Structures are given as C-alpha cells and as structure tokens.
A protein has these predicted regions:
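Conserved C-terminal structural/oligomerization subdomain of aldehyde/semialdehyde dehydrogenase
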Residues: 2-52, 58, 62, 108-117, ...
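Rossmann-like NAD(P) dinucleotide-binding subdomain of oxidoreductase/dehydrogenase enzymes
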Residues: 171, 190, 200-356, 545, ...
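Hydrophobic face of alpha-helices
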Residues: 126-129, 148-155, 163, 167, ...
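Short, basic/aromatic recognition patches
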Residues: 74-99
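Residue-level signal for inorganic ion chemistry
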Residues: 111, 132, 147, 250, ...
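ALDH superfamily catalytic-core signature
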Residues: 271-276, 298-300, 304, 311-459, ...
C-alpha cells in the first residue's frame, strides 16, 4: 500500500514479504536470533516496583466546525478514499500476500472500493500457529511492565499521530459518523490500552499471606498455548482489545478480523507494530471463518478463545470445543460477548423528553448495529402519545447518508446481507404490526435503512423477541397499573441479557425494576440509554444468551488469560518426619 495510507510517523520498513509457498515454521524471529537464545533473556534488568501511569479516560474531541481535529480528519478521509489499500496477512512479522483477493467497500457507497485484502489458506493458519508458538518462548518471559509499555505506547500513538487514520478507516469502512468513530476507534481503544495495564498491575499485586518461616507467592503465568481472537465489524475498539488483552498477560494470539471491518483492523495491526509489538505475538489472519476456526479449534495448543459476534456462531464454537476436549493440552478458556435484545422499560413517572432522546440515540446511533442498541421499549399508556410524538419528531429530523458529510446522524448498515435481513423484518412489521415512522430501505447507492419505530399490542411479537441488529425499535404499550407485570414480561421475552434501562422518577419503581430485572441485563442503566459503556466506568458484558459476562475493560477479563501458580518457599524445613502427637506421654 502507498506510504500515504498511514501517518508519516506510522511508516516503518516493511518486513520481508512471504508468499504462501514459504514456510513460517523454520523462520526464526529477530528475538530467536538474539544472543544465546535463552528463554529468560527478556526478563528486564530492573530493580524496583514499577507503577504504570494512572489511567484517565481519553477526552472525546468535538470535531466542531473550525476545530483542528475536524480539519485533520477531513483531510485523512479524502486521502484514504483515494487510496487502494493492499491488506496482507501478517504472520510472525512477515506480510503474506496470498493473491486470493476480497474487495473492501464503503457501506454507504458500495461501488467505491477502498482496497483489497488477501484471504488466508489452510497453510497460512498452520504458519500462524507455528509463529505464535515461537513468539511465546520469549514473550511469556517478558516482565509484565515491558509488555504493558508496548500497549501504553500504542495508546499514545493512537491518541496523537494515528487518531485520524483509525477514525477515517472506521468511518469509510464501517460507515460510522465522526462522533461514533471517535468514541470507538479512538477513545475506547485508547482506554483499553491504558486501563488494562492498570488492571494487570492490580492483579499482579495480589499476593498471598506469608509468615516468618515461609514465603508464599502467586506466579501469574500466561496460558499454555495460543489464544484465538475473533473480532466483529461493529467496534474497532473491540477489534483492538480482543487480541491485545490476552497478549498483555503474556499470551500469543491468532487474530481473525471481521471481513467487513478489514481496513481498520489492518491499521490496528500496523499501529501495534510501530508501538514495538514483537513479531508473532499477534498474528493477523483474515479469511474464511469456518476454515480458520476448524483448524484452530482442533489444535491441541488451543488455550483460549476471545470472541465477539453472534450467539449462533459462539454456540457452534463452544460445541466444537466440547467435542474436542480430549485433543487439548489444557481446558481452553472460552470468553464471548454475543447477541442482545436490549430494552428500555418506562414507568408512568418517566420524563417523556428524556425517554424519547434515549430511544432515538440508543436505537438509531450507528444504525442500531451496537451490541447494546435499544431494540425494544415498553411504555405506559398514559405517556405513550407524548413519547411517540417526540420520538417521531426526532426521527424526522435525523439526517442519513454519506458519513463524510458531518451533518448526518446515520450512515449505512454494514453490508448487503444485513440490508436484506433487516428489510425482511421491516416487511414483517408492515404486515403484522404498525409502522409508526420509517420503514423504508434504499440500497441503490449504499445500504441505507431509515430509522424505524414499530408499535405492537402483542408482548410476544417477533420484533420484540429476535435480534435484528439494525435501526428498528419496537414498542409495546402497556396499562399503567401493570408495572410489575410488564417487568416480568421484559425479563422473560428474550433469551439475551446484555443491556437494559429503566426510566422513572419514582424511586420505588426503580427499585422494582432493579430487582425483577436483575438477571435481564449485564449492564443496567437508570434514566439513561443502554449504550455507551465507558472503560473503567461501566465494565461491559452480559449473560444468558449474550455471552460469558467476563466484562471487557476490567480486571475480571484479564483473569481469564492467566493460569496462576502458587509457590511456597520454606525457610526452615523440618528435619524430623515425626509429628509432636506421636510422642509418648
């Protein structure tokens, strides 16, 4: 790809390119070639307890007219749109060009090709496994502070010279607006890379009690084998966090990025290389999901899976792993964040203005393609007319179109498959419920679907139960006096339990919702939309059909990527096998 594809500071000499005919198995990394090849050589020569810089959430830039960040982003959008990125595999630090190419297109202008990515073959997956194994010999023995320094450096690069590049790639390749890209590709990913070292430090600080005769210690070892990271299209920050969180804890990773978010994923990989990530620690392997998963999930060195995607795919992977348990060296750690059917339930005391804004923002930002997006709402009869009218007025005011036009609130849905699926739900709504506003899909230029509000009298209606993953919100209106009854309906309607919110100005009603919906959402909001979790503030994840609830952006997630070893050293070992009770009286 051309040098203009990344900021000047982000360009480094390209490592040796490799074709599919070259075997990665026998090619040593630069660290394998270092003096003596001793596995302990990377332990830092440093005396002192080091502390990572205290993490602070990255401020969200406004991109207001006249601001320097707006000008820089506009310039990068223009230059990136004119480039045709050539996106290779990156295995053991080598760029692999397979020649089997797939186009990267703009969802909001699907005739515009941004570049092409090389599709991996089975032999490339084998090469990635070998590269991960080689890198683990060294990386697992780095002092944790040195590993943390790589990701702290990556955070600083993203906060400065790489910010416009990653935001532009997310906007053009995933059809996010400038604001949605900023809070995702910039701020949240920066936060992951700053907060995770802080959480790792806290974890490593946890040591057992000892007395004067012994020293008890916990050795927080990485897992034995490789971690398989499978990342989604809808959040660049998740694409960056899923491979790097296990890597921070000393693991090596094979990363399969989403085919519909390849441009931003590639730039993440190049940023990490500039930050000093050693070859083979993370291996970038785009390609057919089924082929890659079949290879990796059958390998004895599979140590973990870090996944974000559909519930059906995660269930299939879990089933495959369960059927292969006799294959593995250790029990694989399986961490997943999957589907959602996220709700807002309103009490009669709710503020209609705040509720309407929450429905519009929570349901239609990023075209409803957030895992946490509002998809179903329950509103009492007494306030529904005002809530409906306010929400429709907002919807009529929303602009939708090319995300490089900063006046637009919405872009396009991600691809033709999503466009078709959402269109089928719209048709179902027209035939079986009442479409209050929206409901139009236009796919000639981009995959555009209007923000849509559907009303139904049936609390078990299909659009209230199934994940749509688009800008479609379905409302059920209930009698005011049925408050506790509707809470039970909310809890039992969906198999998912990711996010949800209650709107009320009555504290008892809030207490009712918090209790009866305790297991209905892993992230629960009071008088706020159920989207926009911030690292360090609202650790994210849900249970039931929404995943393993291992809370990305917290210490809880990092615990899954270590295998502790308890070490006891005795200073005065016994010299007599007999115990005192054995003595004669």
């Amino acid at each position: 790809m051309s040098a203009s594809a990344a900021p000047a500071s982000a360009i480094e000499p390209t490592r040796r390119a490799a074709s599919t005919g070259q075997s990665a198995d026998d090619r040593p990394t630069s660290r394998d070639q270092s003096e003596n090849g001793d596995a302990t050589r990377a332990v830092s020569g440093f005396n002192g307890n080091r502390r990572v810089p205290p993490p602070v959430n990255e401020p969200v830039r406004s991109y207001a007219p006249g601001s320097p960040e707006r000008a820089a982003l506009k310039e990068r959008l223009h230059s990136m749109a004119d480039e045709r990125a050539d996106i290779p595999l990156i295995i053991g630090g080598d760029e692999v060009h397979t020649g089997e190419l797939v186009d990267v297109v703009m969802p909001h202008n699907h005739q515009h090709v941004l570049g092409q990515w090389h599709k991996s073959g089975a032999e490339n997956v084998d090469q990635a496994i070998a590269a991960a194994r080689r890198a683990a010999r060294d990386w697992s023995n780095w002092a944790w502070e040195d590993r943390a320094a790589v990701f702290l450096k990556a955070a600083e690069l993203l906060a400065t010279t790489w910010r416009s590049t990653l935001n532009a790639a997310t906007m053009l390749g995933q059809s996010k607006t400038a604001f949605q890209a900023e809070i995702d590709a910039a701020c949240e990913l920066i936060d992951f890379w700053r907060f995770n070292p802080h959480y790792a430090q806290s974890l490593y600080d946890e040591q057992p009690l000892s007395d004067r005769t012994m020293w008890n210690q916990l050795d927080y070892r990485p897992l034995e084998g490789f971690v398989y990271a499978v990342t989604p299209f809808n959040f660049t920050s998740i694409a960056g966090n899923l491979p790097t969180a296990p890597a921070l804890m000393g693991n090596t990773v094979i990363w399969k990025p989403a085919s519909s978010a390849m441009l931003s994923a590639y730039y993440i990989m190049k940023l990490l290389e500039e930050a000093g990530l050693p070859p083979g620690v993370i291996n970038f392997v785009p390609g057919d999901a089924a082929m890659i998963s079949n290879k990796l999930l059958a390998h004895r060195d599979l140590a973990g899976v870090h996944f974000t995607g559909s519930t059906a795919v995660f269930n299939s992977m879990w089933k495959t792993i369960g059927a292969s348990m006799s294959t593995y060296k250790s029990y694989p750690r399986i961490v997943g964040e999957t589907g959602g059917k996220d709700f807002i339930v309103a009490h009669a005391s709710a503020d209609p203005a705040a509720l309407s804004v929450a429905i519009a923002r929570g349901g239609f930002e990023y075209q409803g393609q957030k895992c946490s997006a509002v998809s179903r709402v329950y509103v009492p009869e007494s306030i529904w007319p005002e809530v409906r009218d306010r929400t429709v007025a907002i919807m009529k005011d929303i602009r939708m179109g090319d995300v490089t036009d900063f006046r637009n609130f919405m872009g396009a849905v991600i691809d033709s498959r999503a466009f078709t699926k959402i269109g089928e739900y719209l048709e179902h709504g027209r035939k079986n419920a009442s479409v209050v506003s929206g409901g139009v899909a236009r796919g000639e230029e981009g995959y555009f679907i209007e923000p849509t509000l559907v009303e139904t009298k049936d609390p078990a209606y299909r659009l209230l139960c199934e994940e749509i993953f688009g800008p479609v919100v379905t409302a059920h209106v209930y009698p005011d006096e049925k408050w506790t009854d509707i809470l039970k309906v909310v809890d039992e309607t969906s198999p998912y339990a990711l996010t949800g919110a209650v709107f009320s100005r009555d504290r008892q009603a809030i207490r009712d919702a918090a209790l009866l919906l305790r297991n209905a959402a892993g992230n629960f909001y009071v008088n706020d939309k159920p989207t926009g979790a911030v690292v360090g503030q609202q650790p994210f994840g849900g249970a039931r059909g929404s995943g393993t609830n291992d809370k990305a952006g917290s210490k809880l997630n990092l615990v899954r990527w270590i295998s502790p070893r308890a070490v006891k050293e005795t200073f005065s070992p016994p010299t007599d096998y007999r115990y005192p009770f054995m003595a004669e009286e």
